[in-house]
Amino acid sequence: MARVCQITGKRPVTGNNVSHAHNKTRRRFLPNLHSHRFWVESENRWVRLRISSKGLRIIDKKGIDAVLADLRARGEKV
């Protein structure tokens, strides 16, 4: 499964580890993803999403029904 947030689209980015001596080695910065279950009252079922912490805040703000409508409009199966 790809490390991508289903709501925000956040994905891993690349950068450098920088030591005290300023040596640089390549690394990946991974998004803070969590698999989370949401109860959707209108559908009377649970929906499992892989979302970042930012995505969780978006759901708190807009509501799960509005977010699911946006996902379905984008063509994602939920």
Curated annotation (Swiss-Prot):
GO terms for biological process: translation. InterPro entries: Ribosomal_bL28, Ribosomal_bL28/bL31-like_sf, Ribosomal_bL28_bact-type, Ribosomal_bL28_sf. One of its GO terms (molecular function) is structural constituent of ribosome. The keyword Nucleotide-binding does not apply. One of its GO terms (cellular component) is cytosolic large ribosomal subunit. The keyword Ribosomal protein applies. Keywords: Ribonucleoprotein, Ribosomal protein. HAMAP family: Ribosomal_bL28. Belongs to the bacterial ribosomal protein bL28 family. This is Large ribosomal subunit protein bL28. It comes from Thioalkalivibrio sulfidiphilus (strain HL-EbGR7).
